[in-house]
Amino acid sequence: MVKFDSGSESEMTNGDELHINSKHEVKSRMANGNGVHNVPDHDQFQDRAEMEVLILPDLFSSLMSVPARENPHYASVKADADEWISFVINADAKWASRNKRVDFTYLASIWAPDCSAFALRTSADWNSWAFLFDDQFDEGHLSNDLEGAINEIARTREIMEGTAPRYTADSEHPIRYVFQTLCDRVKQNPEGFYAGKPSSERFYRRWMWAHELYWEGLVAQVRTNVEGRSFTRGPEEYLAMRRGSLGAYPALVNNEWAYGIDLPEEVADHPLVFEIMIIMSDQILLVKDILSYEKDLRLGVDHNMVRLLKAKGLSTQQAINEVGVMINNCYRRYYRALSELPCFGEEADRALLGYLEVEKNHALGSLLWSYNTGRYFKSKEDGARVRKTRELLIPKKMAAL
């Protein structure tokens, strides 16, 4: 069992948006699709004649063709992590059950198969925080409230900078409390509190920088919503916004911490190292946009490349094919950047190789998690069917949107 002390000296909600009121109670209503598939109407379309059959690109090619490994601490960490987040947000039994199926610990387990139990628990809790935090901006109360979005980010930034008040588990702001515990943990060694040398100031600055990129993307996303520009943007503008708001940047740096990777400044600041981070973020979000297409249609989520290309005049299949081309181009961009990287020396290059492994595991884990947890499908079995056949079935009445 993994225990921690917060130092008391923050695509999950299953289609339900969480509402956390001043009494620290979680309420939910059908609103967005960051969790497992749970729509009774979906089963009404069993007749293939009523479905549009979309052929997906091979999403397990190139860097994604390698076998994944699972962290040996997965089972014990999952039990503790699921129980803790449900307690912190005072979730009801229905939410807690769904959260177990979403399985953020599995995602973290593929991301960092060799990290300690403490680091895996921190990564799983970061995933819980990120999805709860993000839901407020996606389809929640901040999705069209630019001032409110900027204010919530400012309060969260204060936590990261150490200028915020200490929150508690029974706080009126449980998402902020979760994030505060994460900041406490990431300042420590990934083996555990006081288990070894704590994180360097250099690394914590990088961790903060990655979160700032995420928050800049969220603000840009809300501004786009307010201006009603979701479908008037070009693909490049969409990618520029989504690679930030996706949250991949801080997740990647969090995984660096889990492995004890502290990139020297000459490596971390090299433009090609950042370019590789951009490339893998693009790959993750483009894969997500294909797999989540039906769910985004159902829930009215506009931030989807397939939907954007359809608004430009492409058919659904043409749009999916085009996104497949973009994904393959990510791999070309990756190998091109890799070939142009200089040698930094033995110690720095060792850290760089660890960083590259983290990047690959992050993309692979996100892909497998989408299929294996039924995140975007009726069930794990439906996800397995889509992976095997590469056929995505969309009700025709929905495909016309």
Swiss-Prot record:
Residues 1-20 are annotated as: Disordered. InterPro entries: Isoprenoid_synthase_dom_sf, Terpene_cyclase-like_2. It holds the Pfam family Terpene_syn_C_2. A motif (DDXXD motif) lies at residues 134-138. GO terms for biological process: isoprenoid biosynthetic process. Mg(2+) 3 binds at residues 292, 296. Mg(2+) 2 binds at residue 139. Belongs to the terpene synthase family. This is Inactive (1R,4R,5S)-(-)-guaia-6,10(14)-diene synthase. The gene is STC5.
